[in-house]
């Protein structure tokens, strides 16, 4: 399972929010490029970047920093936040980003998701950000009324290459992932599902392993890495592709 460090950009700085609240942003670094290099050097196989300014404004704000990160790193970078039209997505991918994550536009203009997935096969993912099972849009500030499972099914049918599923209520809380919601989404689609929100310990990461066989292919870790609650290299040894232990579908453990 992929362990994917998250870098959230706000005002040019690396921050973490609490349950999507911009007013509760905590700054963990003022050098996004340096932070990205740090995670890559620690063994990350992919990075997850979010332009929080862009998510709120509706168009990318931290594009220069994101492009620099994508060009400096030798690992894939996926980016979300403020991607709401074809040209913006094309510029992002042209800058070296491997995968664009669409959020608000997936709810408001699903036909665009289908068109982009056709134009850029394998590079268009969809972020499903849900609060109590209902999808939130526009930087998590608005409630769409659409269920996460319904949106997941629709986006998979339209050609999305992966789904990044965030439980807003657990984001930044370190209280553990929403396993029930992840299980429901993974069961509803046949494309990879990436978990996000709530990871606060190595135990939380291990709790995701039984879902790997059901389609949960990775987990995004943010605050837990920045506070030291989770060590990236330990996480990679525990659940990464080179882990020493596998977990069967029935939750029992066995040697790999």
From Swiss-Prot:
Catalyses which reaction(s): 1-(5-phospho-beta-D-ribosyl)-5-[(5-phospho-beta-D-ribosylamino)methylideneamino]imidazole-4-carboxamide = 5-[(5-phospho-1-deoxy-D-ribulos-1-ylimino)methylamino]-1-(5-phospho-beta-D-ribosyl)imidazole-4-carboxamide
GO cellular-component term (any): cytoplasm
Lineage top rank: taxon: Bacteria
Sorted UniProt keywords: Amino-acid biosynthesis, Cytoplasm, Histidine biosynthesis, Isomerase
Primary localisation category: cytoplasm
Keyword Cell wall biogenesis/degradation: no
Location(s), subcellular: Cytoplasm
Location of the active site: 8 (proton acceptor), 129 (proton donor)
Family stated for the protein in its record: Belongs to the HisA/HisF family.
Protein name per Swiss-Prot or TrEMBL: 1-(5-phosphoribosyl)-5-[(5-phosphoribosylamino)methylideneamino] imidazole-4-carboxamide isomerase
Lineage: Bacteria, Bacillati, Cyanobacteriota, Cyanophyceae, Synechococcales
